[in-house]
Amino acid sequence: NWKVYPGDVGYDSGHTWIILGQCKDKSAVIVHSTPNAGVQISGTPTPSGSYSSQAITLAQKYMSRYAGYTKYDYHTSSGNYIRRGNYFRWNRSTLSDPDGYLNMTADQILADLFN
């Protein structure tokens, strides 16, 4: 199935990430932090392992706007976070979604956040 939702918190041994949104090809745009480059947006490959994913393309589009993209050599592709780790999902009756992100794709969410 490989369905993730905006706001899902993923984790495994030694790393944590937040899902910003999922693309139609089932890849996901995540936000995470690295020791050398700080907080960054990355895209995952598709669940089948293709690095020609919509999420990686979106991460490159948005991260290339910032000086750190070149200065810190941001990696806009990440490991296959869709298939690894565990996820914490917010209780829909507890946490509201005033912007409607739950029903948006990653490209719609990023356009809203960055425009």
Placement of each model-derived feature along the sequence:
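...with weaker cross-activation on analogous glycine-rich loops/strands in unrelated enzymes
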Residues: N1-T46
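Low-complexity, Gly/Ser/Thr/Pro-rich intrinsically disordered linker/tail segments
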Residues: P47-N115
